[in-house]
């Protein structure tokens, strides 16, 4: 249900963190994030937390932990400011939601750097086979 809500918001064109994250991932990986990552492995999207199935899923685990440390802004709805320089994301140092931007930059870069571990079979990885991790962060 939450995935459908997120997709609906993205389709409305709201300029918030989720849309900005989508744009970063799309540009870095050339993959449509909603289709490629929203249900990937044990940690991407709304799948929850568990032992990562591969390096791509580890990117999501790290991203979840990063979001858990953000206190100043909404990780889903508040927008931030960033630019592209030589194919890299540069977060605006002075923006109040810079921490959210840095989390999103890290996961988009991680996805790009681990494209060789991405497996289509992990898109709908059954959560029942995810091994819970007592301290994921």
Curated annotation (Swiss-Prot):
The keyword Metal-binding does not apply. GO terms for molecular function: calcium ion binding; calcium-dependent phospholipase A2 activity; phospholipid binding; toxin activity. Keywords: Blood coagulation cascade inhibiting toxin, Disulfide bond, Hemostasis impairing toxin, Myotoxin, Secreted, Signal, Toxin. GO terms for biological process: arachidonate secretion; lipid catabolic process; negative regulation of T cell proliferation; phospholipid metabolic process. PROSITE patterns: PA2_ASP, PA2_HIS. Disulfide bonds join 42-130, 44-60, 59-110, 65-137, 66-103, 73-97, 91-101. CDD domains: PLA2c. One of its GO terms (cellular component) is extracellular region. Expressed by the venom gland. It holds the Pfam family Phospholip_A2_1. Residues 1-16 form the signal peptide. Its main location: secreted. It is found in: Secreted. Snake venom phospholipase A2 homolog that induces local edema a few hours after injection (5-10 ug) in the hind paw, and shows weak anticoagulant and myotoxic activities. Belongs to the phospholipase A2 family. Group II subfamily. N49 sub-subfamily. This is Basic phospholipase A2 homolog CTs-R6. It comes from Trimeresurus stejnegeri. The lineage of its organism: Eukaryota, Metazoa, Chordata, Craniata, Vertebrata.
């Amino acid at each position: 249900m939450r995935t459908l809500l997120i997709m609906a918001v993205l389709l409305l064109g709201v300029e918030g963190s989720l849309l900005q994250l989508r744009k970063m991932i799309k540009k870095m990986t050339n993959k449509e994030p909603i289709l490629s990552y929203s249900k990937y492995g044990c940690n991407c999207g709304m799948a929850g937390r568990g032992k990562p199935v591969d390096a791509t899923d580890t990117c999501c685990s790290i991203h979840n932990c990063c979001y858990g440390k953000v206190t100043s802004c909404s990780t889903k709805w508040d927008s931030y400011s960033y630019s592209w320089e030589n194919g890299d994301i540069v977060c605006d140092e002075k923006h109040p939601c810079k921490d959210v931007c840095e989390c999103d930059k890290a996961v988009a870069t991680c996805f790009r750097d681990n494209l060789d571990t991405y497996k289509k079979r992990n898109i709908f990885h059954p959560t029942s086979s995810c091994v819970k991790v007592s301290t994921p962060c």
